[in-house]
């Protein structure tokens, strides 16, 4: 089906902190409501041989336990939270992508990202057979699709990004 929808991609840079924000605005230009089943704030495309993703998971009394894993070629890794407003306890919507090797404190190329959203989210990392990494982040509306009324506007939460060629300590 075809819907009268306009999607705007917004990017804002903050030179003083070397960060970027990216988000999307969805405009329903029709008269009827539509359901949004997924709404990504941002997507990235990278190319190198190996990718490692660091995430921060946990539970009460053991929050923000750091774990790092390689995204194998042809595979996808997803960080998902469907706990609503308990997201901060179960896992952070933040990540580190390390290129060509595990993340190091003071060397190596890394991208840090955090979705500025306290509710359900989905962050995914797909390593293609051709050595591209496609990554995206956004709120997860799968448990309850968002109804965007006719003439309505929906703004996704921003994904905050920064990059360093000198390890995660500099980023």
Predicted feature residues:
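Short beta-strand and strand-turn-strand segments in soluble, beta-rich domains
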Residues: 135-139
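Short helix/loop capping segments that flank catalytic or ligand/cofactor-binding pockets
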Residues: 34-35, 123, 156-157, 164-165
């Amino acid at each position: 089906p075809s819907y009268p929808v306009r999607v705007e991609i917004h990017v804002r840079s903050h030179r003083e902190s070397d960060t970027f924000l990216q988000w999307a605005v969805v405009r329903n230009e029709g008269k009827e409501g539509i359901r949004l089943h997924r709404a990504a704030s941002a997507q990235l495309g990278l190319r190198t041989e190996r990718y490692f993703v660091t995430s921060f998971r946990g539970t009460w009394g053991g929050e923000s336990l750091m774990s790092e894993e390689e995204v194998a070629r042809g595979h996808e890794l997803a960080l998902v939270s469907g706990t609503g407003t308990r997201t901060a306890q179960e896992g952070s919507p933040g990540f580190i992508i390390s290129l060509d090797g595990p993340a190091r404190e003071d060397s190596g190329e890394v991208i840090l990202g955090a979705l500025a959203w306290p509710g359900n989210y989905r962050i995914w990392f797909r390593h293609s057979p051709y050595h591209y990494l496609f990554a995206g982040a956004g709120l997860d509306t799968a448990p309850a699709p968002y109804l965007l009324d006719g003439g309505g506007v929906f703004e996704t939460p921003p994904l905050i990004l920064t990059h360093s060629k000198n390890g995660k300590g500099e980023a």
